[in-house]
């Protein structure tokens, strides 16, 4: 590709509204342009990368036995009513009506559509197992689109759906897709981790996320120092302490704390160790509980895991914190002074709190706390659950090593849906005995456009993008110095360009009438792995200059050997 016949829309300055590195560099490298909030046009350079990611994903998913199809972006609303997800998805599901006032949605995912297709097309166990996938545009009406294509409203996604006669078959399909994901991300040259995850709005049982490790990642992932265990922060289990609860050494006393409305203020003003405090959080109770709200009690230095809390049968979904008015009406005190002692509402205690003794907690009176509180003496312990986020150094749930925390960007997710959708939509087949069996489903997604941004977050330097070779927009750049003034430079560049392209190598030939400094900066910004600089001075010595983008090195290579040198770099 010649730059004179290409849309090379690089920018010198970083746009003010670009927060993360990938967004900044995608704009500066001329990969994308914003059309509206969360909507982006992919320019030629960006599209080349996107297509490479797509093709790697397609090849590995094909190799796993899946079959490509293509489903509409517009879906009938009635399908979403069949599964009950029309309400669960909330405002992210964009709804509209056509000219006949028939309701439709823009596809955020395609479980309903694919299940409808399979129930009409597949009738016998002999047609199974079946795994269908597509690479298609999706739309989710994000409340706050940000970070460029990392969290856009419209995005490109590979979504696959497997159908099996039993759970054993589902496990095989799931494992095959897990392996396909690993092969795809390995080929892309990404540092990633598959982690245990919560199934969320998709539903089902077992699930794993695939995270590209990056400091800018929105998600925290926990992994063992001595095993393959890894989970996202929502799923990671906080193991129950093995030590028994110490015997009380203090009597419970009431302490005036008029200026301590937070744990931090309590610790600072009254000298109590934060590990000896508990905080009591109130959330809306489910319909099964004989109370409007329920208390969740965690240690003062820990954070509530909202997903774990929402998964408790006593807690309403979605999770909703009680407001100040509710607390004052039901308890008579504000949020900073609440605790379990004397509380006439149900409460659930975190595992770490269950082994505490002589701790401090709110007295359910404004401006007062109890110190020296002990379970079973001052208040009955009751139900104990895992309520908190894990922290660095916690024991690993696998029993090996401790947990480390790193930030990651979720680029893929695989689910064992079971019969959650197939039962709701009556998707079954006749088995070998002629009996109707509801199908076991799996679903699998890769955020193709998000992979592009994630790769940049992981691969960049002060000069621009440093692409893994497999997904770079071009493999080699040819930069001829003053070719419009030097005939031999032009001839050498044209000859080399013809040779490399004939070999199937993707080359960007910078034939612009630009200053060398501008050309070099653009090539580095775009992140092309290999650059060949052709100039009169080096040719006088019989050489071309070769630059390796990732190693940030350059060397003189004999003109006659340059093609073999490039071939060696690519092998």
UniProtKB/Swiss-Prot annotation:
Record keywords, A-Z: Aminoacyl-tRNA synthetase, ATP-binding, Cytoplasm, Ligase, Nucleotide-binding, Protein biosynthesis
Main EC class the enzyme belongs to: ligase
SUPFAM superfamilies: Class II aaRS ABD-related, Class II aaRS and biotin synthetases, YbaK/ProRS associated domain
GO MF terms, alphabetically ordered: aminoacyl-tRNA deacylase activity; ATP binding; proline-tRNA ligase activity
EC annotation from Swiss-Prot or TrEMBL: 6.1.1.15
Catalyzed chemical reaction(s): tRNA(Pro) + L-proline + ATP = L-prolyl-tRNA(Pro) + AMP + diphosphate
Pfam families registered for this protein in UniProt: HGTP_anticodon, tRNA-synt_2b, tRNA_edit
InterPro entries per the UniProt record, alphabetical: aa-tRNA-synt_IIb, aa-tRNA-synth_II, aa-tRNA-synth_II/BPL/LPL, Anticodon-bd, Anticodon-bd_dom_sf, Pro-tRNA-ligase_IIa, Pro-tRNA-synth_IIa_bac-type, Pro-tRNA-Synthase_IIa_type1
Organism domain of life: Bacteria
GO cellular-component term (any): cytosol
Subcellular location: Cytoplasm
Coiled-coil residue windows: none
GO BP annotation list: prolyl-tRNA aminoacylation
Subunit and partners: Homodimer.
Domain notes: Consists of three domains: the N-terminal catalytic domain, the editing domain and the C-terminal anticodon-binding domain.
Functional summary from the UniProt entry: Catalyzes the attachment of proline to tRNA(Pro) in a two-step reaction: proline is first activated by ATP to form Pro-AMP and then transferred to the acceptor end of tRNA(Pro). As ProRS can inadvertently accommodate and process non-cognate amino acids such as alanine and cysteine, to avoid such errors it has two additional distinct editing activities against alanine. One activity is designated as 'pretransfer' editing and involves the tRNA(Pro)-independent hydrolysis of activated Ala-AMP.
Similarity comment: family membership: Belongs to the class-II aminoacyl-tRNA synthetase family. ProS type 1 subfamily.
The protein's name: Proline--tRNA ligase
UniProt lineage: Bacteria, Pseudomonadati, Pseudomonadota, Gammaproteobacteria, Vibrionales
Gene name of this polypeptide: proS
